[in-house]
């Protein structure tokens, strides 16, 4: 068996994010259960002034 960088490629096969119920983007983290885009399941939507795409 090989240990080191070559065996680290096996970690990237599974999907980390799934589709969010609120915003519909593929940003809901499966293990953390939080959307990276809208902040679901928090009551307030995730919004920052330095993010330009929704202004």
Swiss-Prot record:
List GO molecular-function terms, semicolon-separated: RNA binding; rRNA binding; structural constituent of ribosome; zinc ion binding
Q: Which species?
A: Nitrosopumilus maritimus (strain SCM1)
> Which residues are noted in the entry as Zn(2+)-binding?
20, 23, 35, 38
Q: Identify the InterPro entries for this entry.
A: Ribosomal_eL37 (IPR001569), Ribosomal_eL37/eL43 (IPR011331), Ribosomal_zn-bd (IPR011332)
Annotated TM spans: none
Note on cofactor: Binds 1 zinc ion per subunit.
Enumerate the cofactors the protein uses.
Answer: Zn(2+)
Return the protein name. Answer: Large ribosomal subunit protein eL37
Q: Where do the zinc-finger regions (C4-type) map?
A: 20-38
Functionally, this protein is described as follows: Binds to the 23S rRNA.
- Domain of life from the UniProt record: Archaea
For this UniProt record, the keywords arranged alphabetically read as follows: Metal-binding, Ribonucleoprotein, Ribosomal protein, RNA-binding, rRNA-binding, Zinc, Zinc-finger
């Amino acid at each position: 068996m090989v240990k080191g960088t070559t065996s680290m490629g096996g970690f990237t096969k599974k999907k980390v994010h799934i589709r969010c119920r609120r915003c519909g983007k593929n940003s809901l983290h499966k293990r953390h259960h939080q959307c990276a885009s809208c902040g679901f399941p928090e009551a307030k939507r995730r919004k920052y002034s330095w993010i330009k795409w929704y202004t």
